[in-house]
């Protein structure tokens, strides 16, 4: 009988956490190279992104294929982010996006998305945020 209150408490915590989640980020990685790309985790933000991704990104992405997954940060309903890193040999692409629902004078909020694509080793990396349809 003592297990039931613990299960209810755990369920309540998970439900409350899900209720404050920020808007999901859909990541679409397109490997347009002629070689296999490897999903790599280096930083703590990349670790958090992997933990919050569903389904989990595949470790190996063959040439000419895509990987699609959603990342939902549990920080706040007004914040989300995704940081991912892919390598092909000595070439690396690091992609980052952040969402902040910025509070303005008068109490209204303006959604702000930022994105970066950082290339190294001769890689060509592009990050886009598609407009809503």
Task: Indicate residue ranges for each PLM-predicted region.
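Sec-dependent signal peptide recognition
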Residues: 2-10
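Aromatic-rich surface patch/π-platform used for binding flat ligands and interfaces
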Residues: 13
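Intrinsically disordered, low-complexity segments enriched in small/polar residues
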Residues: 20-133
């Amino acid at each position: 009988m003592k297990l039931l209150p613990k299960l209810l408490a755990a369920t309540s915590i998970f439900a409350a956490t899900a209720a404050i989640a920020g808007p999901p980020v859909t990541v679409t990685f397109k490997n347009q190279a002629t070689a296999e790309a490897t999903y790599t985790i280096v930083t703590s933000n990349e670790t958090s992104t992997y933990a919050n991704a569903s389904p989990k990104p595949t470790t190996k992405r063959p040439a000419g294929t895509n990987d699609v997954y959603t990342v939902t940060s549990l920080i706040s309903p007004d914040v989300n982010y995704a940081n991912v890193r892919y390598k092909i040999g000595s070439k690396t692409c690091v992609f980052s996006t952040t969402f902040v629902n910025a509070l303005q004078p008068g109490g209204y909020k303006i959604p702000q998305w930022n994105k970066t694509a950082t290339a190294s080793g001769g890689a060509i990396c592009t990050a886009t945020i598609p407009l809503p349809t």
